[in-house]
From Swiss-Prot:
GO terms for biological process: fatty acid metabolic process. Its EC number is 6.2.1.16. It is found in: Cytoplasm; Nucleus. It is an enzyme of class 6 (ligase). Keywords: ATP-binding, Cytoplasm, Fatty acid metabolism, Ligase, Lipid metabolism, Nucleotide-binding, Nucleus. Residues 18-35 have a biased composition (Low complexity). Activates acetoacetate to acetoacetyl-CoA. Negatively regulates let-60 Ras activity during vulval induction. This is Acetoacetyl-CoA synthetase. Belongs to the ATP-dependent AMP-binding enzyme family. The gene is sur-5. Present in most cells of the organism. It catalyses: acetoacetate + ATP + CoA = acetoacetyl-CoA + AMP + diphosphate. Residues 1-35 are annotated as: Disordered.
Amino acid sequence: MTAVSANGKTTEKHENGAHTNGTTNGTTNGSMNGNEISHVQKLQPVYYKPPQNLETFELSLRNHFEEKTNKKFADYREFHRFTCDNYGIFWEDLLKLSDVKLHQNYNQVIDHNLKINERPRWFNGATLNYTENVIERGTATDIAVLNASIEETVTEYTYDNLRKDVYRIATSLRNYGIGPGDTVCGFVPNTYDTLVAVFATAAVGAAWCSASVDFGPAGVLDRFRQVHPKVLFTVNHVTYKKKLIDQTDKINEIVKELPTLEKIVVSDTFTSVKFDATKYNQSDKFSSLEEFKTPIADVVLPFVYTPVPFSDPLFVMFSSGTTGIPKAMVHTVGGTLLKHIEEHLVQGDSKKHDRMFFYTTCGWMMYNWMISFLYSKGSVVLFDECPLAPDTHIIMKIAAKTQSTMIGMGAKLYDEYLRLQIPFNTLYDLSKIHTVYSTGSPLKKECFAYINTYIAPGALIASISGGTDIIGCFVGGIKSLSITPGECQCLFLGMDIKSFNYMDEEIINSDEQGELVCVTPFPSMPSHFLNDTDGKKYRDAYFARLEPFWAHGDFVRVNHSTGGVEMLGRSDATLNRGGVRIGTAEIYSVVEKIPHIADCIVAGRLVEEGMDEEVLLFVKMVPGQELTHSIQAAIVSKLRNDMSPRHVPNKIYAVDDIPYTSSGKKVEVAVKQIVSGKAVQKASSIRNPESLDHFVQYRL
């Protein structure tokens, strides 16, 4: 392992992965000053266009199917249609061409007689191991992981380091009897130790479930109680905004309520405070990570991974829980792996030299998505701190220092960069970046322009959208198409996406807004929900609305000239004005540009016995500003002129704060329920749950 300096050059080497100091050279403190602001001119983006003689995995895959079927696909859209019409062949050939290692072969890809709502199983008879597939492909001496800190130190771990650490933890888990059918939990930050724990868990055939360290005990228990874990990985301290935060009280409260726990493993690698078992209740169950690790000399080599059936559990993921106890979704070993291979290798064209830096916590599905990137034989960059305070530049500093080639984060963070107008690429070397990911909420057109001006001109902007429900994406980016600002470039291969109008009819050759629907099975559907023996929760979540099709809950507009998709917000938060549906993102795109408005959220409130909706707009003002009549008039005028009279709200109110989930999504449905007079539980996944109190006074 090596630590690298601010210019990306190696400065010191440590076999144990530790760094001797936190100093860096040639970096700024991230504060905005007059010189930076003066550099900002009108945005002049350089948008991505496919180069001549483009060579990608997707084009190779397209050529494979052309030769196999004696067809010629005119473009990506024709190829996409083929992969949906022939989804069994597509996923089978992708599994073979991407070299997925199976211990036992399959006897059936899928039963094509079963519809998507019947949840057919994939690759029946096949056995494999997720960890083996993901971490055994890379060259031993190549860098697998770069662990970055708020102090701007970066510690590197090779594939050999990673494998040996996984073997040591996996051997210890086996010694505690952990294997298929068991669940291991992590109350953890996004660090190297966590990554090792995830891979070690999957290496022995057990399922992994995690919660972010910014969750309170109640939020963690809402999730972990459902899975009955035997082992818990956690940390004694975390840092946030450069402040050291003791986790002892949280851990004690969590462990007290989880009687199935047999072992609690505490990491102290990335803090200055060492593990002390006497601080914990039930201290006999606790050990440090170093104590828990089997010495490498005692690990039986070559290490033997536990093969499990394709549809065995890999990850237990949770719904946001914004309107109740989070639903526990079980994602399969093979389905997750194959979907992530398609997204990283085919859609993303990830290669061995790539470095992926996606800013995420371990409570967001993007973490699970990110770690599968190692299947490409490249590197992942890990960072778990505040991205804006005290240093608004920290993400880009780390991207530059690690020479990341692919970066990603929630769309709200790009919104903040746009507001600050920081010309990052004039301050740091971001020249290696060729792909920029955004997700969590719709990415504004202005953010496209900002990214392709001040972060990575000419880079592919992959605005991706899917969800925890599929542990992946329905739509996103592809290198064989040009960028259209404001749109997700394309429908992903093998994902048979349609848009249905308010009469539940498919929208064909029209740019009409509609509900995003998937009509054929795909591998990364949850196998089941926990505590759902009759399957009712599963059916209600996806099929009750448009059975037999999967209704995902997104309101979209498919651009039939480009093939791109504009995400308009959640369909359950979509506004209904006289029978015309309006996506909330359209209102935000106008209102958030108006001076003196910091943020906003909109909700529909049913009136006239549910036949129509009254639209309420709530705005958060910039500190020191008030919602005046002139600002209200400006909102009305801009919405009427830029959108339509139907976009004009019935009422506009000022509130102190806007509620967000921990992954950066506005909590629209909860606000809608509150103003409609319904009781709403304050979910632990809401970053600022007290903000919901502001809306109670506006209920019916």
